[in-house]
């Protein structure tokens, strides 16, 4: 396995560990999720460049669209929670249930 793939996989694992460890604040969870999506996008882009299958070039773009939607929804949720409760704790997400 080339070193670039190992580095990208390591970046994904570090972001995953960060998501699992720093779950108290929503902003840190969102940053770790963005790191995971960025490493997945980079890995998919590199793999699609190495493959000779032409339809595989659209997969990184679709993943990038999903990452942008996830970031927009996460930031909207963060703004709503911080305006309502004044804090960005993940525990406040339970208070939003009907």
From Swiss-Prot:
GO molecular function, one term: NADH dehydrogenase (ubiquinone) activity
Gene giving rise to this polypeptide: MT-ND4L
PANTHER family reported in the protein's UniProt record: NADH-UBIQUINONE OXIDOREDUCTASE CHAIN 4L, NADH-UBIQUINONE OXIDOREDUCTASE SUBUNIT ND4L
Keyword Transmembrane in annotation: yes
Membrane topology: Multi-pass membrane protein
Coiled coil spans: none
Localization in the cell: Mitochondrion inner membrane
Protein name as it appears in the record: NADH-ubiquinone oxidoreductase chain 4L
Catalytic activity: a ubiquinone + NADH + 5 H(+)(in) = a ubiquinol + NAD(+) + 4 H(+)(out)
UniProt lineage: Eukaryota, Metazoa, Chordata, Craniata, Vertebrata
